[in-house]
């Protein structure tokens, strides 16, 4: 299926969900673990009906969900790439999940979802990616998984993705990308500044804002 991007996702009007990095994310609040289990069981049935299922994390008082397709396609010139991204299948699953949550009287908390990725600046991603793939995931297949680049992704979805950027000559080569919903971006940025951080580069804001701590270590606040 075709990968869906910005305007297409916005037109879907999935009020319980937020696009972060490659997938759609949602959080539903639950009173107890048993309620979480019942919710997830119902999601299993909904997913079976569509032949597609979410990734699920159960925590104290919440159920976190991510929907993404492993076989999304997009065209770059004459080349067709198969990637991990959102497709129509994911929109259909997200709507079905929203219906299940409504039937169980669960409340969505979309402003609380987040996604973390790691970045490493290098001029030799093809050379070093195999090392990071086996170190992080234990599997060489993590290199380029669901991506046309050398990006490292855990085949089992346990770890943050590691992507490779251009070498800049700066002493810090690792940095963290934090994806947040658009409606909490300003609040999160203000909290960083209030804690002593500084804005280093907001030329691509609100999509990307580079911030730094008091020692000059940088991170990137992202809105997908």
Describe the role of every protein-language-model region:
Residues 68, 75, 84-88, 107-110, 115-123, 169-189, 209-212, ...:
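Vicinal oxygen chelate
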Residues 102, 106-127:
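N-terminal beta-strand motif that seeds the catalytic metal site of vicinal oxygen chelate
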Residues 44-54, 100-104, 136-140, 194-200:
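A common structural junction motif
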Residues 2-3, 61-110:
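A cross-kingdom feature marking charged/low-complexity
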Residues 1-35, 49, 63-64, 70-71:
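Hydrophobic, helix-prone linear segments
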Residues 17-21, 110-111, 168-171:
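Short, flexible turn/loop "capping" segments at secondary-structure junctions
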Residues 32-43, 126-139, 188-193:
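Amphipathic alpha-helical segments
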